[in-house]
């Protein structure tokens, strides 16, 4: 609203009256003023709510200057206390437990550890499942505490570097193909059995095969024939007594029918040879083989 201003003077003073001026009020009045106050109040309420939520989140998530909850940030990396669950892949350089506790990796399905090259291709994999443990790599090796190789597996073969490979199963060890070893020995006071249930058993060595029983006996049982053959050497039975208990005993035949029969003769050094059978012994006649 506008109003006219008048200037009053004392009597006898002549002052020129200024022209009439219009004066305008500056400000927000009415419903605009109430809306502005309401908007400022709403902003203040939102600010207080945000501050309260921020304080609540900091308290619930256990934020601190050294980390968040059980997750602490150290100079060596991240340190996590207690059990943790990762819903997505985890990429780290090293995972280790505390000095006084073990490291446990657990999953309801399986645990898979992959090693990748710079191109992202899998170069090694360890998969622990419910029924099997699978290792995929070009070279697999188990070392002792001092770094000595104990077990090595690769495409060329499997090598056990321990002083002794011991199989404690009741059925022993089953090999589908050949086995190369310098020594096969049973435990003390236990029997050693080499068995092939459906096929033959062969032992080959370029410098000989040595079988020895220190305190017990040695048996070779066969349903068919047992053949002891030496192509260039001799067959030596070095014992005080050589017995053939199950040797079949012959029966007298007609006289003059000794043709085609031989008798076994023994040299002083134990060498055996055959001599044509006759009514009397003929070993002395053919004893030149003992010379």
UniProtKB/Swiss-Prot annotation:
Name of protein: Gamma-sarcoglycan
Subcellular localization(s) per the UniProt record: Cell membrane, Sarcolemma; Cytoplasm, Cytoskeleton
Q: Which family does it belong to?
A: Belongs to the sarcoglycan beta/delta/gamma/zeta family.
Cystine pairs annotated here are 265-290, 267-283
Q: Which gene encodes it?
A: SGCG
Origin species, per record, is Mesocricetus auratus (Golden hamster)
What keywords are annotated for this sequence in UniProt?
Cell membrane, Cytoplasm, Cytoskeleton, Disulfide bond, Glycoprotein, Membrane, Signal-anchor, Transmembrane, Transmembrane helix
Function statement: Component of the sarcoglycan complex, a subcomplex of the dystrophin-glycoprotein complex which forms a link between the F-actin cytoskeleton and the extracellular matrix.
Q: Which residues lie on this side of the membrane: Cytoplasmic?
A: 1-37
């Amino acid at each position: 609203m506008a109003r006219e201003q008048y200037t009053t003077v004392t009597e006898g003073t002549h002052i020129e009256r200024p022209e009439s001026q219009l004066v305008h009020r500056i400000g927000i009045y009415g419903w605009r003023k109430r809306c502005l106050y309401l908007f400022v109040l709403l902003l203040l309420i939102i600010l207080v709510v945000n501050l309260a939520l921020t304080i609540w989140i900091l308290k619930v998530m256990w934020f601190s200057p050294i980390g968040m909850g059980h997750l602490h940030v150290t100079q060596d990396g991240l340190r996590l206390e207690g059990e943790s669950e990762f819903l997505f892949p985890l990429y780290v350089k090293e995972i280790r437990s505390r000095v006084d506790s073990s490291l446990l990796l657990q999953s309801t399905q399986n645990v898979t550890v992959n090693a990748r090259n710079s191109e992202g291709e899998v170069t090694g994999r360890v998969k622990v499942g419910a029924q099997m443990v699978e290792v995929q790599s070009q070279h697999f090796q188990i070392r002792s505490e001092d770094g000595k190789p104990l077990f090595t597996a690769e495409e060329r073969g499997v090598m056990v570097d321990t002083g002794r490979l011991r199989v404690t199963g009741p059925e022993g060890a089953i090999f589908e193909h050949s086995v190369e070893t310098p020594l096969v020995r049973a435990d003390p006071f236990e029997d050693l059995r080499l068995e092939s249930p459906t096929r033959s058993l062969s032992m080959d060595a370029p410098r000989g095969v040595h079988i020895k029983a220190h305190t017990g006996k040695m048996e070779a049982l066969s349903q068919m024939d047992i053949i002891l053959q030496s192509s260039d050497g001799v067959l030596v039975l070095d014992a005080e007594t050589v017995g053939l208990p199950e040797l079949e005993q012959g029966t007298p035949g007609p006289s003059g029918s000794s043709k085609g029969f031989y008798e076994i003769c023994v040299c002083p050094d134990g060498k055996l040879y055959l001599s044509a059978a006759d009514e009397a012994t003929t070993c002395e006649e053919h004893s030149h083989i003992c010379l």
